[in-house]
Amino acid sequence: MTDSLSPTLELAVELIKRPSVTPHDAGCQELLSQRLQTIGFEITDLPFGEVQNFWARRGSQAPLVVFAGHTDVVPTGPEEKWEHPPFAAEVKDGVLHGRGAADMKGSLAAFMTACERFVKKHPNHRGSIGWLITSDEEGHAVNGTVKVVEYLVDKGEVIDWCIVGEPSSTHTVGDVIKNGRRGSIGATLIVKGVQGHVAYPHLADNPIHKAAPALAELANEKWDEGNAFFPATSLQISNINGGTGATNVIPGELNIMFNLRFSTELNADVIKQRSEAILQKHGLDYDIEWRLYGEPFLTSKGPLIEATQKAIKHVRGSDTTLSTSGGTSDGRFIAPTGAQVVELGPCNATIHRINEQVLVSEIDQLSSIYEHILEELLVVGSE
């Protein structure tokens, strides 16, 4: 079977067959590291807890262009509902099926073969190439990229440009690249009351009744107008839980969870201050715990955006759209170091779904795009 596969597809198949459900790596990183060592990369394994990470670098000079990605995948859901077994990596009618095909083992394979071709053609390229790989992107994301970035900062490593292999495309590979992401902050709110009998409300204090106007104001708050790169900030209440399950008992507390996806017009401190001002305005007795998942980041212009646009135009013959839509990515840990960051990967229509799949032609084209980005950044004008 493998005789008929392109090098990129062959590697993608090998990776998908390793059931690396987060935070497990299932040997994917060992496979990648061995390939990278063969073409002159120095490998540093960086395990934290049960999470596997590695940093690889070829070259010692600036500028440094880094590929960031993850080997872990989300759980499959009921395997009997898959048309093709999720870890069989079956190829049929030009489509690669399997968990991780689009998110993001196809990208890992594409960048690997791009690097192999690039190094063979340009063994004395300027600057350096790095790989930052984790098995903790789809899970808690506490022992993965964020820890590797801390290690790199402590070592004095400076990333100039970073390509994150997240599935950014919508209809065809490269039609959309992410040049930023909104910030994400979540809150767990406990509104306190006094439990009692519904027939004697004067002897109780109903936290649901007290919280309702405050929650309505939070939900309707106009946080900002957004800007040219980001939509307006959005707050969504995701969980509300209160009561004993009985109809005749006023609950003693109400538990609420909400999340804000915010633009560069705001920061986490301002969100906390404005949210709690609303809670206090309504006289609530409450406890609140905040968790910042990431500040917003943006690469509005520069060599990385230009190189990516040129590469897509060269391979696909089409222009690309810059976007900051969607959820968070590990780019949020890399951008604060000062690096320019873009996300470029396959189409995302089936990510995290049953029957995840990617067109074989997409990952082959993606490999060519990655190779041309490297040439634009590390070759053009230097040879």
UniProtKB/Swiss-Prot annotation:
Native organism: Hahella chejuensis (strain KCTC 2396)
Pathway participation: Amino-acid biosynthesis; L-lysine biosynthesis via DAP pathway; LL-2,6-diaminopimelate from (S)-tetrahydrodipicolinate (succinylase route): step 3/3
One family name in Pfam for this protein: Peptidase_M20
Assembly, per entry: Homodimer.
CDD domains xrefs: M20_DapE_proteobac (cd03891)
Binding site for Zn(2+) 2: D103, E138, H352
Gene Ontology molecular-function annotations: acetylornithine deacetylase activity; cobalt ion binding; succinyl-diaminopimelate desuccinylase activity; zinc ion binding
Positions contributing to Zn(2+) 1 binding: H70, D103, E166
This protein's UniProt keywords: Amino-acid biosynthesis, Cobalt, Diaminopimelate biosynthesis, Hydrolase, Lysine biosynthesis, Metal-binding, Zinc
Family named by the database record: Belongs to the peptidase M20A family. DapE subfamily.
Cofactor section: Zn(2+); Co(2+)
Coiled-coil segments: none
Record GO biological process: diaminopimelate biosynthetic process; L-arginine biosynthetic process; lysine biosynthetic process via diaminopimelate
Superkingdom per UniProt: Bacteria
NCBIfam families, sorted: dapE_proteo (TIGR01246), PRK13009.1 (NF009557)
EC number(s) reported in the record: 3.5.1.18
Gene3D superfamilies on file: Zn peptidases
Cystine crosslinks: none
Role description: Catalyzes the hydrolysis of N-succinyl-L,L-diaminopimelic acid (SDAP), forming succinate and LL-2,6-diaminopimelate (DAP), an intermediate involved in the bacterial biosynthesis of lysine and meso-diaminopimelic acid, an essential component of bacterial cell walls.
Catalytic reactions on record: N-succinyl-(2S,6S)-2,6-diaminopimelate + H2O = (2S,6S)-2,6-diaminopimelate + succinate
Catalytic residues, chain numbering: D72, E137
SUPFAM superfamilies assigned to the protein according to its UniProt record, in alphabetical order: Bacterial exopeptidase dimerisation domain, Zn-dependent exopeptidases
Cofactor info, note text: Binds 2 Zn(2+) or Co(2+) ions per subunit.
Name used for this protein in its record: Succinyl-diaminopimelate desuccinylase
Gene: dapE
InterPro entries referenced in this protein's UniProt entry, alphabetically: Bact_exopeptidase_dim_dom, DapE_proteobac, Peptidase_M20, Peptidase_M20_dimer, Peptidase_M20A
Class of this enzyme: hydrolase
